[in-house]
Amino acid sequence: MKINPKNGIDKLIFGMKQNDVIALYGKPNRNYKDEDDNVIFAYNSLKMRLTFYKDEDFKLGYIVASSADMELFGNKIIGRTISDVKAALAQKGITKFTQEDFDTFENYFNEDNWIIFQTEFDEVVKFEIGAIINDKDEFDWKFKG
């Protein structure tokens, strides 16, 4: 599955509605609401959790994924060391990361692309990507369906 910075993952494009996603991947294994009443879809086979924002008319705005099949710029990311991933990203001009530490986990956040690499024991175990917020402080929805 190809990660498309600022747009989504694979066929998932930020701004899609729940029915658009179901048309592509079928019904999710889990469907629930979080503490903010956002709708969450979880797909076991894809190893993805999708968030549809309540305040944005339930548009797809955030994806958390841990599938070993994911690729960013042609490189797999899950299971690789964060230094390898960051070196590959540097070749594409992505060099600025904010690091947060939590017990054995670290998050490496790049705000320009709204991506997070979560590591444990120096290895990428999870990837998060969110819809971009533009200069007007609004979401830049990419899906035009």
Predicted regions and their residues:
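A short, surface-exposed helix-loop junction/capping segment
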Residues: M1-P5
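A cross-family detector of function-defining hotspots
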Residues: N7, M16-K59, E71-L72, K76-G145
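Extracytoplasmic Gram-positive cell-surface binding/anchoring modules and repeats
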Residues: L12
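Intrinsically disordered, low-complexity regulatory segments enriched in Ser/Thr/Pro
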Residues: L60-A68
